[in-house]
């Protein structure tokens, strides 16, 4: 069995790790970076760029450069948070046929799992390049507060990328694994505050030493799947755009190119203000009007940035309060606070967390890498390479069904340890009712319609009977990934109906298979592209070398040789401009043949000249050779 890799599929950045010789290792990508921007670009010549290369060209290709797509995964187009995002991103968010939020690139609608799969493919390739072997299995992390649809959609993304997802693991739990694996004996309770690029999670986790085994038990989890560094960036973008509008009367929101430049500048300024008190945002030629070009120059202080985002930081403390309450612990019971996610580098965030918990957060956990490392540890546990770790995670939201009057009746309460199975008996609402619809919902609201609808199915052929008489047993079964199976059984007839809750990514198995094939086709296209570029480079090198040879040969080249080479070079120069691999290879062969006789002639002359020079040098060479020959003392013995 190959290695099971750990992937942190982040909103802003992604990271891949493995366990090697018992120690976790974060793998550097082809660019030499330990994290990869979760940015995907579709270029005009049909190439798909992922990571730094996509980020670099974002300003010139804003409509087809996708970022923060994880925020759309498993969401409906009409969700308020999606609607808010539409005006803030330069690319197009559209409604899929089933009402999901998808993106549109070059006139083609694409599902978020399909886009995320491109990032996962890059992570897979990074691991394969390092290991020198094929990778097919992975543990992928998700925000703890992801609902069932979002988890299923993440699993779909893995499948599209050609990965068998062995486990979906919560990000704070993964960070706790990374933190707690090397800690000594004894029990301690930690809070993992995870503020990433697009999501926020808080988990209260108990690490216990049970018979020499590290037991990680999640006591409670809470969060907000639409609160993260992207929101901090957007506050700054809004401020810069408003300042510019006040000064010039021009609204930059209508200019995707300007919006993309603003985004990059806002992110850069935010990062700089974590270590300095003031910075300047300077964007020359941001736009133009009838009076000429306009420049954006704004001095920004840390205090100003903090005033813009203070409410976002405070917003993160509400889930923290709830998680502590749900865990049955008090703040004084928390031994350590772990910060995860790039946004926790902001001094205001660190201060808010320290003030709330009454202690400084730990600084010995890398906020960008801890989650991927934890995923790799979980992968090693599943592979049997790590034996002394037991992980007890929880379901983040209450699961139930809609009952009479539109009430949400819970079957599995939030923060229940998973995997778990729970059954409850329900009955009919009307006399002689022969079918019931089981509507599965997820959330904390009492009214079913206010919660997330996960799916519905019918149990038919119930024998007619007075209301309340038939006994219908509904069973909820959550696996270790937090993914739900629901079944309903008529106890009188034994008739059963079940449903695996599918992602609201709305992707059927056929669609996923099609996307897998598309991804494979892309891989084939990428291979052909690399082959074409390689052939082109070879031919260009040959043209240059041949021209240099002809120049150096001067009169030694006959008129026929020169004519043949000139014709072959012209043909090669034409071929190298195109995309026809066969033509490029044919031109390479022709040019090699045309120039080979001249090259051989020159080589023979050089050899002859070299041999002549050696002969002219005669026996004096040995004496002049210097140090090496002088070491042979035997020479002196001839003179005895």
Swiss-Prot record:
It holds the Pfam family HSP70. Disulfide bonds: none annotated. Residues 626-640 have a biased composition (Acidic residues). Residues 606-640 are annotated as: Disordered. Residues 606-621 have a biased composition (Low complexity). CDD domains: ASKHA_NBD_HSP70_DnaK-like. PROSITE patterns: HSP70_1, HSP70_2, HSP70_3. The modification Phosphothreonine is found at residue 199. SUPFAM superfamilies: Actin-like ATPase domain, Heat shock protein 70kD (HSP70), C-terminal subdomain, Heat shock protein 70kD (HSP70), peptide-binding domain. The keyword Nucleotide-binding applies. InterPro entries: ATPase_NBD, Chaperone_DnaK, Heat_shock_70_CS, HSP70_C_sf, HSP70_peptide-bd_sf, Hsp_70_fam. Induction: By stress conditions e.g. heat shock. GO terms for molecular function: ATP binding; ATP-dependent protein folding chaperone; unfolded protein binding. Keywords: ATP-binding, Chaperone, Nucleotide-binding, Phosphoprotein, Stress response. Acts as a chaperone. PANTHER family: HEAT SHOCK PROTEIN 70KDA. Belongs to the heat shock protein 70 family. This is Chaperone protein DnaK. It comes from Cellvibrio japonicus (strain Ueda107) (Pseudomonas fluorescens subsp. cellulosa). The lineage of its organism: Bacteria, Pseudomonadati, Pseudomonadota, Gammaproteobacteria, Cellvibrionales. The gene is dnaK.
């Amino acid at each position: 069995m190959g290695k099971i890799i750990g992937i942190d599929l982040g909103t802003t950045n992604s990271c891949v790790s493995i366990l090697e010789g018992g120690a976790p290792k974060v793998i550097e990508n082809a660019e030499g970076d330990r994290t990869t921007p979760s940015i995907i670009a579709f270029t005009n010549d049909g190439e798909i760029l992922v990571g730094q290369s996509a980020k670099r060209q974002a300003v010139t290709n804003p409509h087809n450069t996708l970022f923060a797509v994880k925020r759309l995964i498993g969401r409906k187009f009409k969700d308020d948070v999606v609607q808010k995002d539409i005006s803030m991103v330069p690319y197009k968010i559209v409604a899929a046929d089933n009402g999901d939020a998808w993106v549109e690139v070059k006139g083609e609608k694409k599902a978020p799992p399909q886009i995320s799969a491109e990032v996962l493919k890059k992570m897979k390739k990074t691991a394969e390049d390092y290991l020198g072997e094929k990778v097919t299995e992975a543990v992928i992390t998700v925000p703890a507060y992801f609902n069932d649809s979002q988890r299923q959609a993440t699993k779909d993304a893995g499948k599209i990328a050609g990965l068998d997802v062995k486990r979906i693991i919560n990000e704070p739990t993964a960070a706790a694994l990374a933190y707690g694996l090397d800690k000594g004996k004894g029990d301690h309770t930690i809070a993992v505050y995870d503020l990433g690029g697009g999501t926020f999670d808080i988990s209260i986790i108990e690490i216990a030493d049970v018979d020499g085994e590290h037991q990680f038990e999640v006591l409670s989890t809470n969060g907000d799947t639409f609160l993260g560094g992207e929101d901090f960036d957007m506050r700054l973008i809004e401020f810069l755009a408003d300042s510019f509008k006040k000064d010039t009367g021009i609204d930059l929101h209508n200019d995707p190119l300007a919006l993309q430049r603003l985004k990059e500048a806002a992110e850069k300024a935010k990062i700089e203000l974590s270590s300095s008190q003031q910075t300047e945002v300077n964007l020359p030629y941001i736009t133009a009007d009838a009076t000429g070009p306009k420049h954006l120059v704004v001095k920004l202080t840390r205090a100003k940035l903090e005033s813009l985002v203070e409410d976002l930081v405070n917003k993160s403390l509400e889930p923290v309060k709830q998680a502590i309450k749900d865990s049955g612990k008090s703040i004084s019971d928390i031994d350590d606070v772990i910060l995860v996610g790039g946004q926790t580098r902001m001094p205001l965030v660190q201060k808010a967390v320290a003030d709330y918990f009454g202690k400084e957060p730990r600084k010995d956990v890398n906020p960008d890498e801890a989650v991927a490392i934890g995923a790799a540890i979980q992968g090693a546990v599943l592979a049997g390479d790590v034996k002394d770790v037991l992980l007890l995670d929880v379901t983040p939201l209450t699961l139930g069904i809609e009952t009479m009057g539109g009430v949400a009746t819970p079957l599995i309460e939030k923060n229940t340890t998973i995997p778990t199975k729970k059954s409850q008996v329900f009955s009919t609402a009307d006399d002689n009712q022969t079918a019931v619809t089981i509507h599965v919902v997820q959330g904390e609201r009492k009214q079913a319609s206010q919660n997330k609808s996960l799916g519905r199915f019918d149990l038919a052929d119930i024998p007619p009977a007075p209301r309340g008489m038939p006994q219908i047993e509904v069973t909820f079964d959550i696996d270790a990934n937090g993914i739900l199976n629901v079944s309903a059984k008529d106890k009188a007839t034994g008739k059963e109906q079940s449903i695996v809750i599918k992602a609201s990514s709305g992707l059927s198995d056929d669609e996923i298979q099609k996307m897998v094939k598309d991804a494979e086709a892309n891989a084939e296209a990428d291979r052909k592209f690399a082959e074409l570029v390689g052939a082109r480079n070879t031919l260009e090198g040959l043209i240059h070398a041949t021209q240099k040879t002809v120049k150096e040969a001067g009169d030694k080249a006959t008129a026929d040789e020169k004519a043949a080479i000139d014709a072959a070079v012209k043909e090669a120069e034409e071929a190298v401009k195109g995309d026809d691999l066969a033509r490029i290879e044919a031109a390479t062969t022709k040019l090699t043949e045309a120039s080979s006789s001249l090259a051989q002639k020159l080589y023979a002359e050089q050899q002859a000249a070299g041999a002549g020079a050696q002969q002219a040098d005669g026996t004096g060479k040995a004496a002049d050779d210097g140090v090496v020959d002088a070491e042979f003392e035997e020479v002196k013995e001839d003179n005895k």
